[in-house]
Amino acid sequence: MSLEGVFNEGFMTTSYDSVVNWAKTGSLWPMTFGLACCAVEMMHAGAARYDMDRFGMLFRPSPRQSDLMIVAGTLCNKMGPALRKVYDQMSEPRWVLSMGSCANGGGYYHYSYSVVRGCDRIVPVDVYVPGCPPTAEALLYGIIQLQQKIRRTNTIARA
């Protein structure tokens, strides 16, 4: 959290945006949308070795309880409407992280008739994590990048 000024002892000033964005970054609740092998690496990142809990992340099974969707794996044409439906059920503010080359652009199956060439054709994506499959460290780096992006946003609309 960036502080604009410190006056006397124990008194500090900051903006409302900074406080709200700091709280948002410390309480991301991701929902897993595991479609293929990238989901295994996502589960690996949630286990004890990498411990996503230290970032304030708690995996939620329901889209109504989560504010981050991690799309991991190959998105087929039949799964596209389900992805959009789950995204629409999430409450605002909501973010999407695309994990792996298949979710980013179709991957090895790019020219297949049944594969969506990137989940950004269905939902807006905030952060892309490259790799096939990306490592757990790459996923954590993508989450940190998303947290930095959230800190830079304005909460209050200015005239």
From Swiss-Prot:
**Which is one Pfam family of this protein?**
Oxidored_q6
UniProt subcellular location: Cell inner membrane
Disulfide feature: none
Q: List, alphabetically, the PROSITE patterns matched.
A: COMPLEX1_20K
Q: GO molecular-function annotation terms?
A: 4 iron, 4 sulfur cluster binding; iron ion binding; NADH dehydrogenase (ubiquinone) activity; NADH:ubiquinone reductase (non-electrogenic) activity; quinone binding
This protein's source sits in the domain of life called Bacteria
Q: Which reaction does it catalyse?
A: a quinone + NADH + 5 H(+)(in) = a quinol + NAD(+) + 4 H(+)(out)
**Cofactor notes:** Binds 1 [4Fe-4S] cluster.
| Subunit structure of this chain's protein | NDH-1 is composed of 14 different subunits. Subunits NuoB, C, D, E, F, and G constitute the peripheral sector of the complex.
Function of the molecule: NDH-1 shuttles electrons from NADH, via FMN and iron-sulfur (Fe-S) centers, to quinones in the respiratory chain. Couples the redox reaction to proton translocation (for every two electrons transferred, four hydrogen ions are translocated across the cytoplasmic membrane), and thus conserves the redox energy in a proton gradient.
**Protein name as it appears in the record:** NADH-quinone oxidoreductase subunit B
Organism of derivation: Polaromonas sp. (strain JS666 / ATCC BAA-500)
Q: What is the lineage of its organism?
A: Bacteria, Pseudomonadati, Pseudomonadota, Betaproteobacteria, Burkholderiales
Gene behind this chain? nuoB
